Amino acid sequence: MDMRADVLIVGAGMVGSALALALQGSGLQVLLLDGSPLSVKPFDPAAAFEPRVSALSAASQRILERLGVWDGIVERRASPYGEMQVWDGSGTGQIHFSAASVHAEVLGHIVENRVVQDALLDRLHDCDLGLLASARLEQMRRSGDDWLLTLADGRKLRAPLVVAADGANSAVRRLTGTPTREWDYLHNAIVTSVRSSQPHQRTAWQRFTDTGPLAFLPLVRDGQEDWCSIVWSTTPAESERLMALDEEGFCRELERAFEGRLGTVLSADPRVCVPLRQRHAKRYVAEGLALIGDAAHVIHPLAGQGVNLGL
């Protein structure tokens, strides 16, 4: 017999999980499925930072507070910032944003995506929502007024509303033939965490260079404010050269590109290089179907705003 739900959310990432929690208490039978085990690892506050982070806005914080998730985030690790410094590498312009200018304590928080995800999963496991872990979607078609989904293990799911929250390479978007508008940015993003000789002053820094933007996003670990998450967007050829450098060579290149604003770059965690591609679904909704988060829109990581848009 087919499993049935009122709302079937495919993808338990940050946006899909947040939607599931938001629907709790609505009277709707909600089923959330994901290809991962949906397990939560014990958090080690002394552990290295995850390479992927988001700059959560005050609006996103309020959403996560209403969902009962925010405390679980700050108990793990969240780094507030109250200033932003942005400048042009050619010296022609700069801009400064301050939380004080809008009568706020902070502009936002830099948080590892894994931290947000685990805090959401903690709440999900405490709720009466239906969770299907390690469930891979294979087929999807209309069946009367419902969508009929077939999983890789042969199980069948049925729902009048399916929400695609399964990321940039959405299987739901592909299986439903939802068209997209997309193009390559012709840039790659190098992401890692680095330690500097000077504290970051709870400031988000961004320099626009001739080959692309370089961001230093403040991180706090064990009370130390000398760590930053960096996102360095540059050409494929330049990113290949930078990825080939040893740690010391990369730190020197990074220090020069950042004009030494935080002194010496002392160390860098292992780097990840991600090709950048814009992808935008031409429609977000269809009969019994909605696309959210990266399944609907993938943007440049310039300001770490993807999760904010999704929420």
Predicted features, each with a name:
Residues 24-51:
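Glycine-rich FAD pyrophosphate-binding loop
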Residues 5-32:
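N-terminal Rossmann-like FAD-binding beta1-loop-alpha1 element of flavoenzymes
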Residues 22, 119, 123, 193:
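Rossmann-fold NAD(P)-dependent oxidoreductase module
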Residues 15, 38, 169:
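Conserved Rossmann-like nucleotide-cofactor binding loop
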Residues 162-271, 276:
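Conserved FAD-binding catalytic core of PHBH/FMO-like flavoproteins
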Residues 2-3, 76-175, 183-188:
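Conserved N-terminal helical subregion
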